[in-house]
């Protein structure tokens, strides 16, 4: 309902879906085609797990989006809405993102978590064990993530010959630590 309401405020359903598809192209999502704002089944509505992960990582850069998908509960007057994403309660560092189910696609989940300043996104499609699988995927990603220092600040990378200068060569040094994350 919320997705349809937003679409209505953004020029109507067709205009909003066009904006969604334009943004997908801008983000380089070549295997994504939207037909509705809700993510429910549609004749030509499709994407991939990889592209959903890329879209989620992009969307989480928006503070408002991140706040909404990471909210466990919201009370407005006498009504309390509870987020269906169980990882927000069960997984340390969980920050959202999207749960879903249709008969055609089964249980689909896009999740994200942050630890030690690092964000990881996981996606499963048609997965009946999605909550446990995501906890394992996120755990594995955080456990296998390594940061290697390639050089420290001030390291001489090479000497460059200076023709006609006051010195025959000058040292090129790194301004800050260089790290490789993998």
List each model region and its residues.
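Substrate-binding clefts and substrate-entry loops adjacent to catalytic sites
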Residues: 1-8, 33-35
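Generic structural marker for isolated residues within well-ordered, non-membrane alpha-helices
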Residues: 3, 20, 84
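Short, charged, amphipathic alpha-helices and their helix-cap/turn boundaries
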Residues: 14-32
């Amino acid at each position: 309902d919320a997705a349809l309401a937003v679409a209505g405020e953004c020029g109507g359903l067709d205009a909003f879906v066009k904006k969604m598809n334009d943004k997908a192209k801008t983000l380089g999502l070549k295997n994504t085609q939207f037909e509705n704002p809700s993510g429910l089944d549609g004749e030509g509505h499709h994407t991939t797990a990889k592209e959903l992960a890329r879209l989620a990582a992009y969307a989480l850069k928006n503070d408002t989006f991140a706040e909404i998908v990471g909210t466990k509960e919201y009370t407005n007057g006498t009504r309390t809405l509870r987020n269906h994403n169980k990882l927000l309660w069960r997984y340390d560092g969980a920050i959202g993102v999207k749960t879903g189910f249709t008969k055609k696609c089964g249980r689909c989940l896009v999740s994200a978590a942050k630890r030690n300043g690092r964000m990881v996104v996981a996606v499963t499609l048609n997965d009946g064990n999605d909550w446990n699988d995501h906890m394992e995927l996120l755990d594995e990603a955080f456990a296998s993530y390594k940061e290697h220092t390639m050089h420290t600040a001030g390291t001489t990378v090479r000497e460059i010959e200076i023709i006609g200068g006051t010195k025959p060569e000058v040292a090129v040094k790194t301004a800050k630590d260089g790290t490789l994350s993998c």
